[in-house]
């Protein structure tokens, strides 16, 4: 079940909010946990034992850590992290590792039967759990004594599909604040966030994404038949689709959280206005970047142990970033691609970029869009070699004229909505309550029309 489905919007969400608001005090966490379990099990219960076992194990780990003498505490986080990573590696990476070993050494290892679909949200909730373990071990938070609160944090359904990866230390105070859980200002913000996120997903992402799908799908024109201009148009469309899909879901997630009384930090901050790759990664998937910074880069020494060590730390972080996104070599290459760009910027390029903002912006967009070409290279119909050939070796083929005529409005709208203009405009609309209400109602009706007519309700980042 996804946020932009008819079932979620018109059945699950209204009933979930009604039950949540009716139950007072600590009972809200119980209701939240039950709703999260129902949400998790909607597509099947085969992975329910996995997440229940992980919740029980990590809850007991926290209690044990709180009672263990200092001399033994160093062993406990290592064991806990290994257990959690083992679950992630088994379901997400085991067959990729087996296939890689077979290619390297012809070992003839058989693939494991881990299911065709990943356990829902495993990449996100494992990282949430590890952040809890790290913060408990370092004393940033106390171990959670309430099993309901801990389980509600791990299973929190607004963040289960595509995050954001909210740290426990940011959620814990809110999980235990029952009196002020629901207030009018936060609920109003929640409605706005959810509505804007839904619009980004169903109006922009899905409409723009149809262009890229038509280019690479077997039922479409096929990448091998397109011209160089159409290849560029297609990868730009994919770049916009990915942004509006992921940013839209992140806003819907934060909107749902706000409706339930939780104030969560934004996961995106207009990344396509960036004037460097460094700035781009401060604005894109902020919760993931922050997680790698806090739990890998800084513990490894960050930039405190000399230039060579810093380069090694950056290499490990960006290799891990690529691997986190999927069990495929293109994701690893994509992560290392950004490592190289960031090293170049850090060592000399940034000072030149600051002198010419327009050139810096064009440079950033070019390499980000090119990076998405590497990112999407595991999709059937979009092999990296063919895509790069189409992009950089001028050649004829199907013209982009038809696609500009059919998708041009959405592409222009996508570019405009990637800028600061919508934020500036909404600030002015919000000054007049009546105008704000009318605009919100019209946008909601438009979103509903798109939701009802939609044939595809998937979330791109749910696959990671």
Question: Where are the regions a protein language model picked out?
Answer:
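Membrane-embedded transmembrane alpha-helical bundles that form the catalytic cores
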Residues: 1-463
């Amino acid at each position: 079940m996804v946020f932009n489905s008819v079932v979620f919007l018109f059945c699950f969400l209204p009933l979930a909010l009604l039950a949540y608001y009716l139950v007072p005090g600590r009972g809200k966490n119980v209701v939240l946990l039950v709703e999260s379990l129902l949400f998790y099990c909607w597509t099947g219960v085969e992975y329910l034992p996995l997440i229940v076992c992980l919740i029980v194990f990590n809850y007991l780990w926290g209690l044990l850590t709180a009672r263990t003498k200092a001399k033994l505490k160093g062993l406990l986080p290592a064991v806990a992290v290994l257990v959690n990573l083992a679950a992630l590696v088994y379901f997400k990476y085991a067959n990729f590792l087996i296939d890689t070993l077979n290619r390297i050494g012809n070992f003839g290892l058989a693939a494991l039967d881990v299911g065709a679909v990943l356990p829902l949200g495993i990449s996100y909730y494992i990282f949430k759990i590890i952040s809890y373990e790290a913060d408990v071990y370092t004393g940033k938070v106390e171990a959670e004594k309430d099993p309901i609160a801990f389980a509600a944090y791990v299973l929190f359904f607004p963040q289960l599909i595509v995050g954001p990866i909210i740290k426990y230390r940011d959620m814990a105070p809110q999980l235990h604040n029952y009196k002020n859980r629901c207030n009018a200002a936060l609920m109003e913000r929640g409605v706005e966030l959810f509505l804007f996120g839904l619009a980004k997903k169903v109006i922009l992402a899905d409409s723009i994404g149809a262009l890229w799908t038509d280019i690479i799908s077997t039922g479409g024109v096929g990448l091998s038949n397109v011209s160089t201009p159409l290849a560029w148009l297609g990868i730009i469309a994919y770049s916009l689709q990915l942004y509006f899909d992921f940013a839209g879901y992140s806003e819907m997630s934060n909107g749902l959280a706000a409706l339930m009384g939780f104030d969560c930090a934004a996961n995106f901050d207009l990344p396509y206005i960036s004037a460097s790759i460094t700035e781009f990664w401060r604005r894109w998937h902020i919760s993931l970047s922050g997680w790698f910074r806090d739990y890998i880069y800084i513990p490894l020494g960050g930039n405190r142990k000399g230039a060579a060590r810093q380069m090694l730390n950056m290499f490990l972080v960006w290799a891990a970033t690529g691997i986190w996104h999927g069990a495929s070599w293109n994701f690893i290459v994509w992560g290392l691609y950004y490592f190289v760009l960031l090293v170049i910027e850090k060592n000399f390029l940034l000072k030149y970029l600051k002198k010419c903002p327009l050139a810096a912006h064009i440079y950033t967009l070019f390499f980000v869009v090119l990076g998405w070409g590497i990112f999407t290279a595991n999709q059937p119909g979009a092999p990296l070699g063919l895509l790069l050939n189409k992009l950089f070796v001028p050649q004829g083929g199907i013209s982009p004229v038809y696609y500009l005529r059919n998708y041009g409005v959405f592409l222009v709208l996508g570019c405009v909505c990637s800028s600061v203009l919508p934020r500036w405009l909404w600030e002015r609309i919000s000054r007049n309550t009546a105008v704000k209400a009318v605009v919100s109602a019209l946008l909601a009706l438009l979103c509903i029309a798109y939701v009802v007519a939609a044939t595809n309700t998937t979330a791109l980042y749910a696959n990671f």
